[in-house]
C-alpha cells in the first residue's frame, strides 16, 4: 500500500511518467453483471468477519446503483450515501433539519429537545422527497442526524457548546462526517463524500474510460490527442492542455486508495456499453510503473 501511495502521489505532483514502481489488485471482468456479482461476493467475504468494514467508492453516484440493487436483492445491510451534494432532497433535508433544530431548541442542546427535533423532521419528510427512489436519501440523512445528536453528548462543555457544535455541523452540511460512527459494515458512497474517512477494505469499481476518469476529462483528452486508444484500453500521453484535468482525476484516485486501512481492490469490465461499443480500461490503470495483479477474494480475505 505504501508503494502505491507514493506512485499515485508522484503522478499527482509531477505531470510525467513516474520512475517509481507499485502494484495494485485489479479484477478484470467480462461485463457489468459479472463485475457487480464479483463485488457482492467480495463484500460477503469481507463482512463474514464482524470486525471488518468495507466501502465501495464510486467516481459518480450513478455508478453504484446496480451494486445497491444487488445488495438489496441479497438482503445485505448497507449504508447508502450515493446522493450528490446538489440533489434537491439533500439540500431540502438540511433546510428542514436546521429549521426544526432551531425551533426545538433555545440555544442549548438538551436531549429531550433533540428528540423533538427528530420527530419534527420525520413529520416533514414529504417535503424532502416525493419519489420512492429518493427515499434512501432521507433515510440515510436522518440516520446521520440521529448519530450527530448522539455524538453531541461527547462534546466537552455546556449544553450551549453542544448546541453550537450541532448548529455548525448542520450549517456547514457536515453530516457526512457522521458516517464514521454508523453500525453498517458496508458503505456505498462517492469518493468525494469519503474524504477524511477510513475503512478496513475499499473496493473501487468501474475503472473504465468515461467513468473514471469521467467524460469531463476523456472528451477533451480525445480532442487534444492526449491518449493512445486500443480496442479495450487507453494510455495517457500528457498533452500540456490536459494537465489540470489529469491532476484532478489522479488526485481523486489517491483519495480513494488512501481510504483503506488494510487493502484496496479495483474492478473493471470491458463489456459492451449502451452504444454496443467495447468499453476501455481507464488510462489510470495503464500508468507506467503500475503493475496490475489479478486476485480472488478467498485468497486474500481470510
Model-derived regions: residue spans:
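A short acidic (Asp/Glu
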Residues: 62-70, 199-200, 276-280
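Helicase P-loop NTPase motor core
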Residues: 1-78
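Conserved short internal alpha-helix adjacent to the catalytic or cofactor-binding core
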Residues: 20-27, 73, 86-116
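Helicase C-terminal subdomain and adjacent C-terminal extension
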Residues: 234-238, 244, 262, 268-302
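Conserved helicase C-terminal RecA-like lobe
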Residues: 100-271
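Conserved helicase motor
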Residues: 61, 82-88
Amino acid at each position: 500500500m505504501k508503494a502505491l501511495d507514493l506512485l499515485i502521489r508522484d503522478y499527482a505532483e509531477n505531470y510525467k511518467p513516474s520512475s517509481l514502481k507499485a502494484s495494485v489488485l485489479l479484477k478484470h471482468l467480462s461485463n457489468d453483471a459479472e463485475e457487480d456479482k464479483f463485488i457482492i461476493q467480495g463484500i460477503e467475504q469481507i463482512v463474514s468477519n464482524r470486525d471488518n468494514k468495507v466501502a465501495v467508492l464510486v467516481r459518480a453516484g450513478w455508478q453504484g446503483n446496480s451494486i445497491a440493487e444487488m445488495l438489496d436483492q441479497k438482503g445485505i445491510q448497507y449504508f447508502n450515501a450515493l446522493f450528490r451534494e446538489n440533489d434537491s432532497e439533500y439540500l431540502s433535508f438540511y433546510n428542514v433539519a436546521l429549521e426544526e433544530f432551531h425551533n426545538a431548541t433555545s440555544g442549548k442542546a438538551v436531549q429531550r429537545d433533540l428528540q423533538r427535533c427528530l420527530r419534527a423532521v420525520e413529520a416533514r419528510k414529504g417535503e424532502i422527497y416525493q419519489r420512492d427512489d429518493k427515499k434512501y436519501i432521507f433515510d440515510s440523512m436522518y440516520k446521520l442526524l440521529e448519530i450527530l445528536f448522539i455524538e453531541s453528548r461527547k462534546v466537552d462543555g455546556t449544553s450551549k457548546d453542544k448546541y453550537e457544535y450541532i448548529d455548525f455541523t448542520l450549517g456547514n452540511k457536515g453530516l457526512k462526517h457522521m458516517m464514521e460512527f454508523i453500525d453498517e459494515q458496508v458503505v456505498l458512497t462517492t469518493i468525494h463524500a469519503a474524504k477524511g474517512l477510513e475503512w478496513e477494505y475499499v473496493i473501487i469499481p468501474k475503472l473504465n474510460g468515461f467513468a473514471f476518469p469521467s467524460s469531463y476529462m476523456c472528451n477533451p483528452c480525445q480532442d487534444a490527442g492526449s491518449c493512445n486508444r486500443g480496442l479495450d484500453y487507453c494510455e495517457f500521453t500528457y498533452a500540456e492542455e490536459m494537465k489540470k484535468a489529469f491532476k484532478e482525476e489522479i488526485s481523486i484516485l489517491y483519495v480513494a486508495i488512501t481510504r483503506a486501512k488494510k487493502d484496496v481492490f479495483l474492478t473493471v469490465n470491458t463489456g459492451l456499453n449502451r452504444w454496443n461499443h467495447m468499453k476501455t480500461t481507464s488510462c489510470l490503470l495503464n500508468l507506467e510503473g503500475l503493475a496490475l495483479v489479478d486476485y480472488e477474494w478467498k485468497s486474500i480475505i481470510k
